[in-house]
Amino acid sequence: MDFRIDEFDVFEKGDFMETIRNVEINQLHDFKNHPFKVEINTELCELMKSIEKEGVLVPLLVRTNPYGDGDEVISGHRRKEAAVWAGETKVPIVIRELYDDQAVVAMVDSNLHRENLKPSEKAFAYKMKLDAMKHQGKRLPEASSVDDGEEHSMINSNELLARQVGESVAQIKRYIRLTNLIPK
């Protein structure tokens, strides 16, 4: 059974307009300063074999490349690499219009769940996400519900990031300090 996308579709998802289509892999560019490395390992080889058999089943998340032509990969760097190794020339993508800070948060969030992340990858990812969160606003409501007239306590970006990733604020700060020691 072949699940490849031949046409494209446009739809609304929450606050975003998204387009799904197939594109040439050479029109996709890696996310600027992407902190996660695509390593050739057993998992990537298994993904490559799956793509050879079924194609890319989950579209890559991209945005229009703000630095030139083509599209910038937000999520799916491993799928893109495995597709190249599998001999694919096109992959399905979801194009989402994202500002820089939104793109950073989406890129980091889509990769932090992976097993075997290196401390250096976490360090740069936490730093990038924290910087993006700070650009969006320094103090955030602790509750994400609609204002119901109740008084909400406020938390800063460090505390919110720590809660989101299951680390302490001190541990987040230790990871981020690593970025001063590690060359990019």
What is the role of each PLM region?
Residues 183-184:
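Short Lys/Arg-enriched helix C-cap and helix-to-coil transition segments
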